Amino acid sequence: MSEFKIVSRKDLYNEGEGLGEDYDSNSSSKNNSEHVEVLVPPTEFEFVEVERTDSSLDLKESNNSAHEQKEEKQEEFEFPLFSFGVVEASTSPAQEEQGSSTQEKDTPQTEVSLMKISLKEPEEEIINQERPKDYYFASYSADQKLQFQQSSIDYDVIIQESTKILEDDLRIRDKWPYCQGRIIDLYKHNARIELEQQKELKIKKRRPGQKQRAAKKLALERTKERDTKAREIKKQLKKKFHKRGGKKNKKKVPLNPLAKAGSTPKFRTE
């Protein structure tokens, strides 16, 4: 510990030469043969430009993936319930026929891997059932909009065309009053139809004359006569073709085929 010297922070930031001289004078009394060098720290900062990279982000992603893999491994574990321990390797049919004891000893043995059970729950699939905006909102190009403007009719155009039609109608009426085409005054037309309907109602409601009343009575009498004659003819036809049998109520005698079995047969010659 005699080789080291306690130096204050103020002495460290002084000039190197003055500090070296003081240190040499003090150390010469203790150890003249040894020479100790003192390193002065730099007082200026060095500015270094470093290009930024995404290594930090890559590290974060790698850490996250490693963490996820670790969690997955923790959720999966081996379950030895259905494992059967050690199973002999399958042999060829020729070796099975030999059945030597040496082959049974030398057969390699393989271990069955244990069943893995995972506690992970299946993630629910998020199905987006929304229709696209094109289904609700139509988007037209500039050419289509121009076509719509050309094919559409404004209010001013309708008024302008209607005035032209009225002018044409007046001109036709003035020049050819007898050839008006389909131009109809609805008020006059409806009034004429109403008059015709009223005339028809009056004709229906008025009382018929004496001759008409007599003709109606005669027609009713003759229709009655025709009906009575038709009924009589129908009755006569029924009596003619639908006669009742006379033996309807006679009692039937049961037939006995052995009633005349003892009688002698009769021939034509007898």
Curated annotation (Swiss-Prot):
Residue ranges, annotated region (Disordered): 1-76, 90-111, 204-270
Residues spanning the membrane: none
Ranges of Polar residues composition bias in the record: 90-102
Domain of life: Eukaryota
Disulfide bonds: none
Basic and acidic residues bias spans: 1-13, 49-73, 218-235
Basic residues bias spans: 204-216, 236-253
This protein's name: Uncharacterized protein YNL050C
Biological source species: Saccharomyces cerevisiae (strain ATCC 204508 / S288c)
Lineage start: Eukaryota, Fungi, Dikarya, Ascomycota, Saccharomycotina
